[in-house]
Amino acid sequence: MKSIVFVALFGLALLALVCSASEDAHKELLKEVVGAMVVDTTDAVQAEERECRWYLGGCSQDGDCCKHLQCHSNYEWCVWDGTFSK
């Protein structure tokens, strides 16, 4: 009877250890995924700043905006200029 209780407690301790290690690995994976997402977002913002501004992007003149967009005079963001051609 005593040995069964000892084995059960040992099994529970082992299970707790495995679950703890699994949780730590899960947290590390989550940190890596979030870090990759932040890097991708930063790269996208830098690419947008190097090229033309997309819809509702900040601007100071029409030349800052992409094709078929113009700089709104009051709010200083790129809006559609009303054209449909390619």
Swiss-Prot record:
- Which Pfam family is one of those matched by this entry? Toxin_12
InterPro entries from the UniProt entry: Huwentoxin-1 (IPR011696), Huwentoxin_CS1 (IPR013140)
Q: Where in the cell is it found?
A: Secreted
One GO cellular component term noted in the UniProt record for this chain:
extracellular region
Keyword vocabulary terms for this entry: Disulfide bond, Ion channel impairing toxin, Knottin, Secreted, Signal, Toxin
Q: Any signal peptide, and if so, which residues? A: 1-21
The residues of the propeptide are: 22-50
The protein's predominant localisation is secreted
Presence of the UniProt keyword Disulfide bond in the record: yes
* Domain of life where this protein originates: Eukaryota
The disulfide bonds in this chain are: C52-C66, C59-C71, C65-C78
Q: In which tissues is it expressed?
A: Expressed by the venom gland.
Instruction: Give the molecular function GO annotations.
Output: ion channel inhibitor activity; toxin activity
The UniProt family comment states:
Belongs to the neurotoxin 10 (Hwtx-1) family. 17 (Hntx-9) subfamily.
- What the record says about its domains? The presence of a 'disulfide through disulfide knot' structurally defines this protein as a knottin.
What is the role of this chain?
Ion channel inhibitor.
Q: State what protein this is by name.
A: Omega-theraphotoxin-Hhn1a 3
Q: From which organism does this entry originate?
A: Cyriopagopus hainanus
